[in-house]
Amino acid sequence: MAKEDVIEVEGKVIEPLPNAMFRVELANGHRVLAHVSGKIRMNFIRILPGDRVTVELSPYDLNRGRIVYRYK
């Protein structure tokens, strides 16, 4: 999938799930299932409930996403 096709939105981590998955509530109120991107995983960045994150959504499946950035 090309980088131009993704939708980037901000959200807040609601709960951690097994296998590095997280339930994220987006700014518009929707809740999505998101996994951690490879760069965040490689740099050992911890994501905890309550963290503000940027999530990339595919236009084909708006219920799943990838966490690409955690705000400080």
Curated annotation (Swiss-Prot):
Compartments, as annotated in UniProt: Cytoplasm
Regions crossing the membrane: none
Keywords: Cytoplasm, Initiation factor, Protein biosynthesis, RNA-binding, rRNA-binding
Domain of life, source organism: Bacteria
GO molecular function, one term: ribosome binding
Coiled-coil regions listed in the entry: none
Residue ranges annotated for the S1-like domain, each copy included: 1-72
One of the record's GO cellular component terms: cytosol
Cited CDD domains: S1_IF1 (cd04451)
Family from the record: Belongs to the IF-1 family.
Subunit and interaction comment: Component of the 30S ribosomal translation pre-initiation complex which assembles on the 30S ribosome in the order IF-2 and IF-3, IF-1 and N-formylmethionyl-tRNA(fMet); mRNA recruitment can occur at any time during PIC assembly.
PANTHER family per the UniProt record, alphabetical: TRANSLATION INITIATION FACTOR IF-1, CHLOROPLASTIC
The protein's role, per its UniProt record: One of the essential components for the initiation of protein synthesis. Stabilizes the binding of IF-2 and IF-3 on the 30S subunit to which N-formylmethionyl-tRNA(fMet) subsequently binds. Helps modulate mRNA selection, yielding the 30S pre-initiation complex (PIC). Upon addition of the 50S ribosomal subunit IF-1, IF-2 and IF-3 are released leaving the mature 70S translation initiation complex.
Protein name: Translation initiation factor IF-1
Organism: Moorella thermoacetica (strain ATCC 39073 / JCM 9320)
Name of encoding gene: infA
